[in-house]
Amino acid sequence: MPKLMEAGLSAKGKTFALIASRFNDFITDRLVSGAVDALVRNGAADKDIHLVKVPGAFEIPLLAKKMAEKGEYDAIVCLGAVIRGSTPHFDYVCAEVSKGIAQVSLEFSVPVIFGIVTTDTIEQAIERAGTKAGNKGWNAAVSAVEMANLMEVVTRA
């Protein structure tokens, strides 16, 4: 039987950075609320949750890198909403943001969670920010807690 390494969902004593896009703030504000709620419900103190707002989703990876460089965060949660329009801009932004977030996580060995809602319509984005499809900010924050704890488990193993 293999040894299973698992981690709990306690955020107590951990520090989290939330990076949120101001663009489409009618969506991202709901994602931020969901993320903060998830962190607090899992034991994080308000003082240990740091929120930074950036102009748009494209700017998130750079700020994630800067926050990771500081070495003060157990996990970084990236929140934004990119909604498809009539030009290829959506594809460029989504591709670069997802690559950038993954790159920061790998470079600094810190969980950097992709909480960017990428949808075809405004309605789909609204659904993913707290209505029919749950709140992806909440989901991203829970992933951040689990990954922060799992990093500790694996480091100690």
Curated annotation (Swiss-Prot):
Name recorded for this polypeptide: 6,7-dimethyl-8-ribityllumazine synthase
Keywords tagged on the record: Riboflavin biosynthesis, Transferase
Binding positions ((2S)-2-hydroxy-3-oxobutyl phosphate): 86-87, 128
Top-level EC class as recorded in UniProt: transferase
GO MF terms held by the record: 6,7-dimethyl-8-ribityllumazine synthase activity
Ligand binding (5-amino-6-(D-ribitylamino)uracil): 23, 57-59, 81-83, 114
Pathway(s): Cofactor biosynthesis; riboflavin biosynthesis; riboflavin from 2-hydroxy-3-oxobutyl phosphate and 5-amino-6-(D-ribitylamino)uracil: step 1/2
Protein family membership: Belongs to the DMRL synthase family.
Function of the molecule: Catalyzes the formation of 6,7-dimethyl-8-ribityllumazine by condensation of 5-amino-6-(D-ribitylamino)uracil with 3,4-dihydroxy-2-butanone 4-phosphate. This is the penultimate step in the biosynthesis of riboflavin.
Pfam families per the UniProt record, alphabetical: DMRL_synthase
EC number: 2.5.1.78
The organism of origin for this protein: Desulfosudis oleivorans (strain DSM 6200 / JCM 39069 / Hxd3) (Desulfococcus oleovorans)
